[in-house]
Amino acid sequence: MRKACFFLTIVTIFLFSGIIAFSQENPSDKATVPFSNPSKPGRVEASVHNGGITVKGYEGKEVIVEARAREKKLSEEDVNVAVAQRAAREAARALGRAVPEEKKKAEEKAAKAAGMRLIQSVTTGLTVEEVNNVMDISVESFKRAVDLIIQVPYSTSLELSAFNNGDIVIENVSGEIEVNNHNGALKLSGVSGVVVASTFNGDVTVNFIKVAPEKPMSFSTWNGDIDVTFPADIKANVKMKSQRGDIYSDFDIKLMATPPSAVEDKRKEGGKYRISIGEYTSGTINGGGPEFQFNTFNGNIFIRKAK
């Protein structure tokens, strides 16, 4: 298999390929990047500190990335939060707490760029790196919000994260999806793989065409509703919890008794006997299957059957 390390900054792309659109007042940068082995499903990892991410599946084999800066600049408080978070991540990596995959990728990037000078972008700071069918996409969004619009082959797996000022939207993707937001909604439609979706302030809305068999999934938020639509024939064990909301479904969910999650007996030492019952409501759909977990604090849960 051919191995490649593909590293781009927008300035470099401009010099060699001419595929960048640039507006001084409202920058917009674009890059088209192939996977090392386009015959196999790839993986895209993208992160934005301030802004949103939209990913759409299409019939092509390359990843098309566009970064669009918003006209409204961020407040000084937003900038300080983003800078502090980035510094914390870099400090953790410097202390050797990065996962092995990150360390390996960092070593490969360093070797490839040995003796070369990094040219920083003066636009959205769009950076795309590709190693062994894994593509990493990031932007500089400290002083103004930047939105990422990405087109990927249908079977691409995704790992996406955002923090402020934007939603994450995914359409027509069949790979595995892990998506995290902090202040924004998650909106997934036409997906047909495994989904792990989490946000803090925002709704989680997912519409499945089909689900991967025997794979667990999780959907969670703190302030918001969870609304997930599944094919009618899914088989699953479901665990559902809403502290300050209700749970609704048009599936025939067979509820199960919730066993104690903890039993503690300290009576011999003069203490107490304590039983703690789990807060989740559990049940099965169509006889049961992999575990699907739904968890919100301030919001309702809707588990829908596709019509």
Regions inferred by a protein language model and the residue ranges of each:
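Acidic (Asp/Glu) and glycine-rich low-complexity loops/linkers
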Residues: 21-47, 52-161, 172, 178, ...
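Flexible, glycine-rich surface segments
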Residues: 193, 198-199, 208-238
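C-terminal/domain-terminus segments
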Residues: 297-307
